[in-house]
Every structure is written in C-alpha cells, then in structure tokens.
C-alpha cells in the first residue's frame, strides 16, 4: 500500500513589505521572530478575547510572507488584516489566491506548498492522495486541523489541542491576555 498524503487546495494570502514580520507577530499567536525564510510555521488568529478565528500556516521570504488558511474563513482573515494595516506598518496585502498543500498522514509530518496545477514532485508522486474518509479519520486521531464545527467563535486554541501554536513568551498579540491567563491556570473553560 502506498503512503497516504493530504492533498488540498487552500486559501492563500500574500503580504509584502518590510514590516510584515512585525505585523504578523502582533496579529497571530506564535513567536515568529526566529522563523527562517522558507520554513513553515502554524499559528492561530484570535479575537481580542482569545477565541479562535483561524489556523494559519506562514512562510517568510525576503519580500514578505505567504499565509495559508488551514481552518477558518479566508475572507474574514483577509478583511481582518486589511482593517488593521496602517501605512506605518509597511505592509501591503494582496488579493486572496489558492495554493496546493501536501502533507503525509503521519505524526509531525512537514508540509509542502506548490502551485495548484503543478505535477506532484517526488516522493509525493509515489504516494497516494488520501480519500475523504481516510483524511477525516486522520484528522480525528491527530486533532488537526480543526473541523468546521470547532471554529464556532466560542472555542480557544487550547480547547482544540493547539497549544503548540500559542507562544507564552513573545509578548503582546491579539488575544494574548486571555491565552496567558488560561495557560497560567493550566486549564480551559
């Protein structure tokens, strides 16, 4: 049997400018300061009260960052970012697009992004795209990504097992006070 992988078209936002890293550092829950150019990192976009709005995957480069929406409403992320970008931020938000995301159905498997119509590179070409049933079984076992009913405006990242996507060390970000309180109490509602 071939190795199974998740093959998905995902919403993609592009941010350009010299202030992109600082902007995303203040808007998302993970610490982005040490993220190297080209590396992928998952993070959460929260409300001011720490409710989960979206799970994002980021990749920085010399000109800015690519943001993939793994769970949540991409149009809400785009509009939310657009509302809080000021000229002093040195950030330009591009229109929404699509990327193709590949990930083996294994614990801690790294993901790869490519253009939507690209031929599968090796070793993906030797694997097998997971069926909807296999993907849902993996999602339920791994707890990732959150399902549509789990992003209901009432849950926080800790309740959905996304503690690795939340930094307790980085300082201020949207929803940070609630996350610090919950992590400090070592509990969820």
Residue positions per predicted region:
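Basic, glycine/lysine-rich polyanion-binding surfaces/domains
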Residues: 1-189
């Amino acid at each position: 049997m071939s190795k199974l992988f998740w093959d998905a078209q995902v919403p993609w936002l592009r941010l350009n400018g010299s202030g992109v890293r600082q902007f995303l550092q203040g808007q998302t829950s993970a610490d982005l300061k040490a993220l190297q150019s080209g590396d992928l990192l998952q993070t959460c976009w929260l409300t001011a009260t720490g409710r989960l709005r979206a799970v994002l995957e980021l990749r920085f480069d010399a000109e800015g960052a690519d943001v993939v929406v793994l769970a949540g409403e991409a149009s809400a992320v785009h509009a939310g970012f657009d509302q809080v970008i000021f000229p002093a931020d040195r950030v330009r938000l591009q229109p929404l697009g699509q990327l193709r995301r590949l990930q083996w159905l294994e614990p801690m498997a790294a993901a790869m992004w490519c253009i939507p119509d690209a031929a599968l590179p090796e070793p993906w070409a030797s694997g097998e795209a997971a069926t909807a049933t296999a993907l849902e079984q993996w999602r339920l076992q791994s707890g990732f990504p959150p399902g549509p009913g789990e992003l209901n405006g009432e849950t926080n990242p800790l309740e959905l097992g996304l503690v690795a996507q939340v930094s307790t060390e980085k300082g201020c970000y949207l929803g940070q006070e609630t996350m610090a309180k919950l992590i400090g109490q070592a509990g969820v509602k």
